[in-house]
Amino acid sequence: EVAIALTEDDRLMEVNREQRGKDTFAVGNIYYGRVKKIMPALNAAFVDVGHEKEAFLHYLDLGTAFLTTQKYVTKLVSDRRRIPEIHKIERQPECAKEGQIADYLKVGDTLLVQVTKEPINSKGPRLSAEISITGRNFVLIPFIEKVMVSNKISRNSERGRLKQLVQSIKPQGFGLIVLT
C-alpha cells in the first residue's frame, strides 16, 4: 500500500491510499488507449486501456475540444523530445453536439482518455476524452479558455473577484473551475 499525506502547518489535511500493483483504474486516472471497436448503434467506442475488459467511450464524452486534444497528443507522440506548448496548438473545430462517433474515431486510433467510472463485475471502465486535472481548489481543463466558479459561491461580488483573480494567474490554453 502507498499512502500520501497532505499537511499544512504540521496539521494533517488529507490522506490518500492506493494498493501497490493493483490494477485499480480509478476515477481520474489518465491513459493512452487504442480504439478496438466502434458501435454505431450505441454511438460509442470500446477502447483498450490495459484493463482485462475494454473500456467504454460514448460520443458525448469526447468533449468539444476533442480534435484539438488529438492534434496536441499526435504532436507530442511524434516528437517526444519537445513537449508542445498547449497555447500554441491551433484550435480545431468543436465536435458537433449531435454527431456520430464514427465521424471522429476509427478502429486502431489512439487517444488520451480519463476514467470517469471504475470497472464493475463484467464491465470495463467508462471513459471521457475531455481530460481534467482536479486539485483541492481548482479543476484544470486544457483547451478550454473559460474561468468558472462553483455555484456554491453565491455572492456575485465574490464570484466576480475570484474570476478576475483566477483569470490573471491562469496558464494560457487552459480553463479553470474554482472549487469551494
What name fits each language-model region?
Residues 1-180:
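Single-stranded RNA-binding surfaces
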